[in-house]
Amino acid sequence: MERNVETFLGCDKEFDEARIVIFGAPFDSTTSYRPGTRFASRTMRAESYGLETYSPYQDLDLEDAAVFDGGDLELCFGDTNKALADITAFTEEVMQAGKLPLMIGGEHLVTLGAVRSVAAHYCHTSDCT
């Protein structure tokens, strides 16, 4: 997996050393009223450079965390089912590699793709239904 050029909060670790994988889901095909949520992940990355990464309360710096930024998924605009399937597949790929997925950006519906994957990965009994 290749690292994104513009990373979130300087999360520039390599995939193999990362514990968390950030990825964007730029999609807004079912947004009503005002589209534009597809630009959220790119904007979040750009604006994150103005944030302080060090927490004096925790005495930790986010730049020291093992986080890989995989960039944005290339989602098919206008094909909601395909976009959700792509998000589900990528989230599963991240979890199969033993890493935690962290999706940013996109409309509310994109969460469904990630939740489907997480549920399939962790719910092996009827307790999850």
Where does each model-flagged region fall?
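Metal-dependent C-N hydrolase catalytic cores
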Residues: 1-128
